[in-house]
Swiss-Prot record:
Organism annotation: Micropogonias undulatus (Atlantic croaker)
Disulfide bonds: 115-192
Database matches in Gene3D superfamilies: Rhodopsin 7-helix transmembrane proteins (1.20.1070.10)
Entries under Pfam families matching the protein: 7tm_1
Role according to the record: Membrane G-protein coupled estrogen receptor that binds to 17-beta-estradiol (E2) with high affinity, leading to rapid and transient activation of numerous intracellular signaling pathways. Plays a role in the embryonic development of sensory and motor neurons. May induce apoptosis and reduce proliferation of brain cells. Involved in maintenance of meiotic arrest in oocytes.
Protein name: G-protein coupled estrogen receptor 1
GO terms (BP aspect): adenylate cyclase-activating G protein-coupled receptor signaling pathway; apoptotic process; cell differentiation; cellular response to estradiol stimulus; cellular response to gonadotropin stimulus; negative regulation of meiotic cell cycle; negative regulation of oocyte maturation; nervous system development
Extracellular side: 1-40, 103-112, 182-202, 267-292
Subunit structure: Homodimer. Heterodimer.
Gene coding for it: gper1
Gene Ontology CC terms, in alphabetical order: axon; basolateral plasma membrane; cytoplasmic vesicle membrane; cytoskeleton; dendritic spine membrane; early endosome; endoplasmic reticulum membrane; Golgi membrane
Amino acid sequence: MEEQTTSLVWIYVNSTEQLNTSYEYNTTYLIEDSDKYQSYVIGLFLSCLYTILLFPIGFIGNILILVVNLNHRGKMAIPDLYFVNLAVADLILVADSLIEVFNLNEKYYDYAVLCTFMSLFLQVNMYSSIFFLTWMSFDRYIALANSMSSSPLRTMQHAKLSCGLIWMASILATLLPFTIVQTQHRGEVHFCFANVFEIQWLEVTIGFLVPFSIIGLCYSLIGRILMRSQKHRGLWPRRQKALRMIVVVVLVFFICWLPENVFISIQLLQGTADPSQRTATTLRHDYPLTGHIVNLAAFSNSCLNPIIYSFLGETFRDKLRLFIKQKASWSVVNRFCHHGLDLHLPVRSEVSEV
């Protein structure tokens, strides 16, 4: 009798433990599922805001910068040429962002070809943007340092050559590591270029830390020159306006790309401490909403540049007004010509001559 009672008690205790364990598991699962759903909804809302508010500005604005400047090719100054190339890089990223911003569940990273292709596009744009901004800061320093004399470095021919070299450097900075990594991971079906630990270090170093060190040095030298030139204030108004626009563009770039690089750096430091976590998607899978927000911040930079360029660039505003007037006058002329033709041309008779 005692043995039966003991066995019944044991069965009851065991069943209770199993029920408690099952309840705790189900509760944990429901909480995690609820958190994922909440993150998904917030991410979807932010993606919709980006698509409605920022994407049209970035896409149409960068195209407008290209069309207006190319329409006034003869009046294009050296800073305008750099901004045109920056607009091309931004347009590539804005077009790519429409796919990336709705990658809420990171499903695109499961397809190696799509993951690699999008990563290559993103890196080429990122490198070209930061390289152009770095070179523009250096160009502004050269312009101010040699304000009293013409510098052989600041000619349109050298500017075009510089743009070509910057694009080549951006492509090489992306394709050379890609080629090396591809040979190391040959035969791996599910290998993605974006998941390589060393590539992430290269992106943070070459694409952020080194360029901003150079930019900081250039602007500290520019500040020193401007402080010394107070007695020649009449010579600086136009230069200060151009300088102000470039400073704002660089600051916006820094603010937009800093969260992305901090996020990647935390991930890299985790991988350094624990080699088993050396994958680019670990932190993004653990904190998908944070990863999505820093992505949106980075993409927003390419949408904000046209606004900065149109509001702070007086030369561009003048070109835009002239461009609109030309288009409006051409439309008036076309309507006048069509109206004149309708009045003076005889109406064709429907009766055929015999």
